[in-house]
Amino acid sequence: MIKSILLCFFFLFPLLLTLFKKLLPSKWKLPPGPTGLPIIGNLHQLGRLLHSSFHKLSLEHGPVMLLRFGVVPMVVISSKEAAKQVLKSRDLETCSRPKLVANGLFTRNFKDIAFAQYGEDWREMKKLVGLELFNPKKHKFFRYIREEEGDLLVKKLSKSSQTQTLVDLRKAFFSFTAGIIFRVSFGQNFRECDFIDMDRLEELVQESETNVFSFAFTDFFPTGLGWLVDRISGQHSRIEKAFSKLTKFFQHVIDEELKIGQSQDHSNLVSSMLDMINRSTEYGSFKITSDHLIAMMTDIVLGGVNAGTITMIWTMTELTRHPRVMKKLREEIRATLGPNKERITEEDLEKVEYLKLVIKETFRLHPPGPFLLPRQVMSDIEIQGYHIPKNAHIKISTYAIGRDPKCWTNPEEFNPERFANTSINYKGQHYELLPFGAGRRSCPGMTLGITILELGLLNILYYFDWSLPNGMTIKDIDMEEDGALTIAKKVPLELIPTLPASLCIK
């Protein structure tokens, strides 16, 4: 594909070369980076997995590396020191987002909080979502939903345990995670909906995520040229098609909420925002509209469902590959919680310390997103002695930082004990572990995300032993990665659950 693009752009070489020269004056001390080609910059040096390509390049060129995507300078951060400088010391100057085509389309011209540019509207929307979805009172109120979904997960797995059949853990975890997030946020149980089922919902989430983070030439090349290439290549059509499907789904959700007259207590986000729309409520500097609602629903679908599902799968993959860790964790869980526990509750989450270490280690090796969402520099700044020009994009590689030997001993080894007796956590104060980001653009759904993750894993590890299919050994587990925003395990993890003789499910 790159070769065909080069042919399309070749006749514009003199013009674009001039643009490059004007974009980054030579008097500045810019970050090092690989030499790019005219017109396309470094695009030809990127493989299928962007995080892996960036990591390899950073090992050669350093933790603050400059690439060029077309005419856009892209700074890649691969060390905790540089990440701290961006996210703490220079947070205000770097906390905006680039206006990328697919992001803007899916969020109704950036009326959300994940992709919106920094400003008053973004601040007010973040406050609103904090009050209506992620405040401690709401989190406590929705506890019953999370525990009910945990019960459903166990009951479903127990059927496979009785017949000793393989379980595709992606489907099991997706149903659990989506069940919680959609009931909490949208007020609807999609197992009972007539307009979609879980399999179609999973396909919709995957397609939406792939397209909202897909490469659009319009984002990195002069407007007319990028626009033309996106249409010739079919990229524009693919993005529009995925957007249309997701919008249609959201409209079904909204119609269902309107049909039942909305929740009287407006406990879920959709009901609460519909009430504000109907009352023409002014929130801060703007009025809440249906576009704000659709944009926030997009954030929830893209930011919540896949990330939790994928992290649970990687955790179970690493536990299966490391029997010592699995045995230690299982013994701690069952010894701490005792035999014949009828159900796992959220009080139990604070009792299993080793599980928290295991999750931290999974975050280190398999962060939910290998990069934090891209930032755009709002004014010229300096990072680690290098000049970063205004409007440059910054990508912070949590993947590379998690494998940095300057931060971690034997970084490729899965070893939860490395977090024992340390204060390192994932709440944004420790820049070697950033699954939820840090600073102004940190993830507002962190508490909900962690609760879902811990609850799902605790349920399946308390009630079941897990084994590979007959004839398969831990050396046969495929660790190949795939994905865009989140990096999933490409080959499904299929295991057999067994209910221990000492436990029973009522």
UniProtKB/Swiss-Prot annotation:
<dbReference type="GO" id="GO:0004497">
    <property type="term" value="F:monooxygenase activity"/>
</dbReference>
<keyword id="KW-0812">Transmembrane</keyword>
<keyword id="KW-0349">Heme</keyword>
<keyword id="KW-0479">Metal-binding</keyword>
<feature type="transmembrane region" description="Helical">
    <location>
        <begin position="5"/>
        <end position="25"/>
    </location>
</feature>
<keyword id="KW-1133">Transmembrane helix</keyword>
<keyword id="KW-0408">Iron</keyword>
<keyword id="KW-0503">Monooxygenase</keyword>
<dbReference type="GO" id="GO:0020037">
    <property type="term" value="F:heme binding"/>
</dbReference>
<dbReference type="InterPro" id="IPR001128">
    <property type="entry name" value="Cyt_P450"/>
</dbReference>
<keyword id="KW-0560">Oxidoreductase</keyword>
<dbReference type="InterPro" id="IPR002401">
    <property type="entry name" value="Cyt_P450_E_grp-I"/>
</dbReference>
<dbReference type="InterPro" id="IPR036396">
    <property type="entry name" value="Cyt_P450_sf"/>
</dbReference>
<comment type="similarity">
    <text>Belongs to the cytochrome P450 family.</text>
</comment>
<protein>
    <recommendedName>
        <fullName>Cytochrome P450 71B8</fullName>
        <ecNumber>1.14.-.-</ecNumber>
    </recommendedName>
</protein>
<dbReference type="Pfam" id="PF00067">
    <property type="entry name" value="p450"/>
</dbReference>
<dbReference type="GO" id="GO:0016020">
    <property type="term" value="C:membrane"/>
</dbReference>
<dbReference type="InterPro" id="IPR017972">
    <property type="entry name" value="Cyt_P450_CS"/>
</dbReference>
<dbReference type="InterPro" id="IPR050193">
    <property type="entry name" value="Cytochrome_P450_71"/>
</dbReference>
<keyword id="KW-0472">Membrane</keyword>
<dbReference type="GO" id="GO:0005506">
    <property type="term" value="F:iron ion binding"/>
</dbReference>
<feature type="binding site" description="axial binding residue">
    <location>
        <position position="443"/>
    </location>
    <ligand>
        <name>heme</name>
    </ligand>
</feature>
<dbReference type="GO" id="GO:0016705">
    <property type="term" value="F:oxidoreductase activity, acting on paired donors, with incorporation or reduction of molecular oxygen"/>
</dbReference>
